[in-house]
Each structure stands twice: as structure tokens, then as C-alpha cells.
Amino acid sequence: MALLRLVATECRNVLQRGYSTASVPTTKMFIDGKFVESKTNDWIDLHDPATNEVVTRVPKCTQDEMQTAVESSKKAYKTWRQSSILSRQQVMLKLQHIIRNNMSELAKNITKEQGKTLIDAEGDVLRGLQVVEHCCSITSLQMGETVPNIAKDMDTYSYHLPLGVTAGIAPFNFPAMIPLWMFPVAITCGNTSIIKPSERVPGATMLLMEMLNEAGCPPGVVNVIHGAHDAVNFVCDNPDIRAVSFVGSDQAGKYIYERAGRNGKRVQCNMGAKNHGVIMADANKENTLNQLAGAAFGAAGQRCMALSTAVFVGEARNWIPDLVERARKLKVNAGHLPGTDLGPVISPQSKQRINELVESGAKEGAKIVLDGRNIKVEGFEKGNFVGPTIISDVTPNMKCYTEEIFGPVLVCLSVDTIDEAIELINNNPYGNGTAIFTTNGATARKFVNDIDVGQVGVNVPIPVPLPMFSFTGSRGSFLGDCHFYGKQGIKFYTQTKTVTQLWREGDVSHTKAAVAMPTMK
């Protein structure tokens, strides 16, 4: 298969079809079904987080190049919107098959650019693939509604029709999953899509474009541009882009929501989080501690649904030393090496910020019971590594609690009752996810009913729903009306047209020929 030839030498695992052949390869744009070299003079160096060696140079696309992508999308929309829903379904059926057969190539690229372990990178791809698989059900997902005989001889029905050109702005932490939340739903509904992947991790998106070509998607239906702030402004301001999807930080999400919304666009923004896990003393101790460690430190804590805050209720606070021992045993190393539990964080700046937030906890009176800030990884001394870190005796006014750390750091608070735990979580401005660990059904039911968070797990540490549901973060974690994927995702990418028609029964044409002599009455 052609795709297998797109992977560079094993020491680099760098995608070649999407890059030039320079000594330091450059990432190309994807315009009108082709990989195109940018003519910009402004480039961003992309570093391997495990070594800080330059992997590729990413262009800050020019205004003309980005406008070319829009023109390509506009042109493709004219025919794509008229394509049958069955033909769009066929593209998704082929795409999911191609992705599944090439998960390891995608995972290698993600590990090289983002740093997460290979097994975690495959999970990144799989969760995105599940959205593609759900899009294969578009023939039932995009159905409208009908009421016959709403009045005498009158029927009313509605269509769910595409919007036009849409755009997705993706983050660095899920290089495959988040773009796959965006463009498959958009184009299966009949839209065209422009994707701006994170300038830190564009490779997975470029691989997906190669796969999309192989699946038979027409040129221009999906285009890819690159850049930073100027590219975001272009997407928010361009009058031909009808809707914008974004996943990322609070600051960027609020900015995009306000700017794109001011320009009349439909916008959905998934933003920051402070996800709490509540540990009851009646929980299954071994299972709970294992799940806490995995959810807090997996992907080096760089998940929007990472369980970054533990709330120990009553005697459960005595479990913290056992949790520390489990976390201490996790292996920190380069993501491509066997046995690695967590790799590096994305950049030296991220590492510095994480370390500063940990230090702020100590200065404010918390205890660092496991300190991973000075970890050394043999052979990767220049990497952005932070080991599992646990801070206990944290209070809600501390900076390490109020800010999203986005690293392998678990902050631990203690309360006496479930009511105090619920109040603590509801007072936090974020509402992405939360979990409770208990064997008591009544306690779990109370928690589910009283908690004001969009996604709740009961003995499930990271309750991200499968795509037949929607990703329903709330409060400070989301801006918009319709959430990502699932039924709400279809609603976001479509507009409703309602038709009311009147055909009077008295106007029905005769169904048999009149053979009697005409009398001219």
C-alpha cells in the first residue's frame, strides 16, 4: 500500500509524502487533494519532545494560501452538497477501514511529534476512528421529521442540510482524535472542511489526508492549512467559513468564540478542565488506586479529561501513601520504547510551567509527597520529562488547584463527607468531567444527581462517551450550543429547512379517461 512508503527511516518515523526532501523536512499544506509546499518565509520548528531535536518545519501559511484553501472548499461544496448521502457514507466506510489498517503508522508519527507512548497513541487514533465509524450511520443520523395532514391537505416536513464551508482548529494533545472529531462529521453531513492542526503536531493530520484521498474523497472537500495566531484570525474572520470547531485552552477558546461569533459564525469550543475524582472509603481500594494513577499520569497528564484532582472522603485519605507507591513505579521514558508508562510533555515551556505550579503548592503550604520535577531519563537528557508528582494537603485557594496544570501532577484534597466533596466540585468553575469511586449505589446516585459537571463516571475515571453520545463538558469547560460528535455534532454541522406544502384533494387529476360525449356544461 502506498501509505506504508510515507514513513521515513525508523529512527525518525517522519512522514515523507507530506514533507519536502530538505535536510530538515517541511510540512506541506493539503489543498484541493494535493500536498502543496508553502511559499511563506515564516516557519515554526517542531521538536521531538523526547530529544528536542527538530523534526520538521511547519509553515505559517500566507493569507493568499489560506484564501486558496477557502476557494477550493467553496468550489467543492457546490458538488459535494449535492452528492448522495450513500456516496458520502461510502467514503466514511472506506476511510475507517484504511485508518484501522494503518494505526501503527499513525501512532509512530504521533509519538515522534507529541511524545506520548505508542500504546497511548494508538488509543488516540482508535477514539477518533470510532467517530468515523459512527459517521457511517449518517443515513439514519441525518434524517429529518415529517408530520402529514398537519392541516387539511397540508403536510410539513424538515430537512437537515449542510452549512457550507466549515473549519476546525485542533490542539496538540490528541493529534489524530480531535481532527477526527471534526472533519468526518462535517463532510459526512455534506459540508466541506478546513482543518488547522496544531503547529506542534501536524503529521497525523497529513497522514489522514493521504488516507482520505485513498478513500475516494473528492478534491477540496477537506483542505489543511498551518499556522498560529494569524491562521486562527483568518478562520474567525473569513466570511465564507460558516462554522468553527475548536479544542484547546481557555484563553484561545474564549478568544475564538468571541471573534468568530462576532462575525456571525456558529462556534463550539471545548476548553480547560479540572477533573475531580472522589474516593469513598468503601471503594475497591486496589482497583481505585490503579485507576487513579492511570487517569492522572497517562499521556503525561496532557488530556483534557485527565483526572488531575483527587478528593479523598473520610478515612480514604489514608490511601495516599499507597497511591504514591503505585505512581512511583510508573516508568518515564521516550514514548517509542517498550515498557514506557508516560513520555515527555510537549515543550520546555510546558515543563517549566508545570514545575512552577508544583512549587507554588509547596510555597502555599501543601506537601509534595512525590516529586517528579528533577527526573533524569538516560539517553534523553534534553527531553521535556516530568515524572509522576503528587501534592497532598491542597486547599481550594491554592494556585495548584485553581489552575489547570496539564502535566503528570495529581493534587489531593481531603473532606469529611460526600456533601463537602460535591460542594467543592460544584464551586470549581470547570465542568468537563468527574468521577466517583464507591461500592455504595445510593452514594453514587446522589453524586450523579447533585454534581454540576457535564460528564460523570461511576468507577470510571475518564468518562469520555462513545460517539453515539456527545462529548458534553459544561460550564467553564465549554462555549457553544451544540457539543462535539453524536447527535449534537450532527446538529452543529447542519441547518434545518422546514417545508409546508398544500395540495388540495379537489385538484387531483382524473385517473381514468372520460369517454362520454362532451356536453360543454
Swiss-Prot record:
Gene Ontology MF terms: malonate-semialdehyde dehydrogenase (acetylating) activity; methylmalonate-semialdehyde dehydrogenase (acylating, NAD) activity
Catalysed reactions, semicolon-separated: 2-methyl-3-oxopropanoate + NAD(+) + CoA + H2O = propanoyl-CoA + hydrogencarbonate + NADH + H(+); 3-oxopropanoate + NAD(+) + CoA + H2O = hydrogencarbonate + acetyl-CoA + NADH + H(+)
Subcellular compartments: Mitochondrion
Classification via SUPFAM superfamilies: ALDH-like
Pfam families: Aldedh (PF00171)
Keyword Oxidoreductase (UniProt): yes
UniProt keyword terms in alphabetical order: Mitochondrion, NAD, Oxidoreductase, Transit peptide
Active site: 304 (nucleophile)
One of the GO BP terms on file: thymine catabolic process
Recorded GO CC terms: mitochondrion
Residues that coordinate or bind NAD(+): 170, 172, 196, 199-200, 249, 404
EC number: 1.2.1.27
Assembly information from the UniProt record: Homotetramer.
Similarity-based family: Belongs to the aldehyde dehydrogenase family.
Described purpose of this protein according to its UniProt entry: Probable malonate and methylmalonate semialdehyde dehydrogenase involved in the catabolism of valine, thymine, and compounds catabolized by way of beta-alanine, including uracil and cytidine.
Name by which UniProt lists this protein: Probable methylmalonate-semialdehyde/malonate-semialdehyde dehydrogenase [acylating], mitochondrial
